[in-house]
Amino acid sequence: MELAPVNLSEGNGSDPEPPAEPRPLFGIGVENFITLVVFGLIFAMGVLGNSLVITVLARSKPGKPRSTTNLFILNLSIADLAYLLFCIPFQATVYALPTWVLGAFICKFIHYFFTVSMLVSIFTLAAMSVDRYVAIVHSRRSSSLRVSRNALLGVGFIWALSIAMASPVAYYQRLFHRDSNQTFCWEHWPNQLHKKAYVVCTFVFGYLLPLLLICFCYAKVLNHLHKKLKNMSKKSEASKKKTAQTVLVVVVVFGISWLPHHVIHLWAEFGAFPLTPASFFFRITAHCLAYSNSSVNPIIYAFLSENFRKAYKQVFKCRVCNESPHGDAKEKNRIDTPPSTNCTHV
């Protein structure tokens, strides 16, 4: 489902021939260099940030169950980290090299996992919004519903559904060879009606409907909080509002980050996507926005969650403490016990 930066055949799938004389516009130059620098920054920030989130959430007391929200955040971070490690370095070669050199398997895998990661992210965010809805609107029943077992089952279902939905991308992604010894990795569907149907279904079920579900859940949450504001303790009110705010910001950022990607796909399938400097810039921006979504969530947690900030600091303190053989045992025990995040207590 990912549009290649050098050709549009992946976008419309109608013709495996590249645009005539694309090098003056799409050749390696200042634009591609800047894009590679942006990719490098996204990769470095995302790998560091998501690794930190995973470390924080993995450091729980033995035998203590993790909260459902934290399990979903952990799943989101794992999906983002895997995407950054497996996709961005390979996709960057498209901007750096004039031809595809990584073979058929990598051609299929990176575009397939790109779509899998996108779907896992939006489905996880939808699950988190439902989790917030149950925790706040149906708080009396939430203790029996919001358990680790149900969250893990949900995570398993999310991955299975995403893997299945993305499978056509892997099937139709293939290599095309030109007489000039150039190779391109393109998505090509023999039946264009099937391609159009798949693009629409991916947009509807992998973007639009999950966002509508998220909007519904948060509308209910905000309405409930407004009605029950007087009956809540200030501490409980602040905790629930902060958790809902954090998840909501993550959702809004996801929606903004992935909207240009879907616009380009729908435009390429049902319109005449132009090959102009402006459209090339739009495509580059869509790529960078989609990729950056995998690196911004840890920053959001740091800005909106005081407990996440404390946990981040404790990860580094723990490393310093482990390197000091004469550290105080009591202080080390305190550091080794991670604080809960705002998402833990609801």
UniProtKB/Swiss-Prot annotation:
Disulphide bond pairs: 107-185
Location, primary (coarse class): membrane
One GO BP: adenylate cyclase-activating G protein-coupled receptor signaling pathway
Cytoplasmic topological intervals: 55-69, 131-150, 218-246, 291-346
Superkingdom: Eukaryota
Modification after translation, per record: Three cysteine residues are found in the C-terminus, at least one of which may be palmitoylated.
Keyword terms: Cell membrane, Disulfide bond, G-protein coupled receptor, Glycoprotein, Lipoprotein, Membrane, Palmitate, Receptor, Transducer, Transmembrane, Transmembrane helix
UniProt note on tissues of expression: Spinal cord, small intestine, Rin14B insulinoma cells and several brain regions, particularly ventral hippocampus, amygdala, supraoptic nucleus, hypothalamus, thalamus, lateral parabrachial nucleus and locus coeruleus.
Protein name: Galanin receptor type 1
Native organism: Rattus norvegicus (Rat)
Subunit structure: Interacts with GRP39 AND HTR1A.
InterPro entries documented for this protein: GAL1_rcpt, Galanin_rcpt, GPCR_Rhodpsn, GPCR_Rhodpsn_7TM
Subcellular location: Cell membrane
Residues anchoring lipid (S-palmitoyl cysteine): 318
Job of this protein: Receptor for the hormone galanin. The activity of this receptor is mediated by G proteins that inhibit adenylate cyclase activity.
Segments on the Extracellular face: 1-33, 91-108, 172-196, 268-269
Glycosylation sites: 7, 12, 181
GO cellular component, one term: plasma membrane
Region described as Disordered: 326-346
Record membrane topology: Multi-pass membrane protein
Family the UniProt entry places it in: Belongs to the G-protein coupled receptor 1 family.
Keyword Membrane: yes
Pfam families xref list: 7tm_1
Compositionally biased region (Basic and acidic residues): 326-335
Residue spans crossing the bilayer: 34-54, 70-90, 109-130, 151-171, 197-217, 247-267, 270-290
GO MF term list: G protein-coupled peptide receptor activity; galanin receptor activity; neuropeptide binding; peptide hormone binding
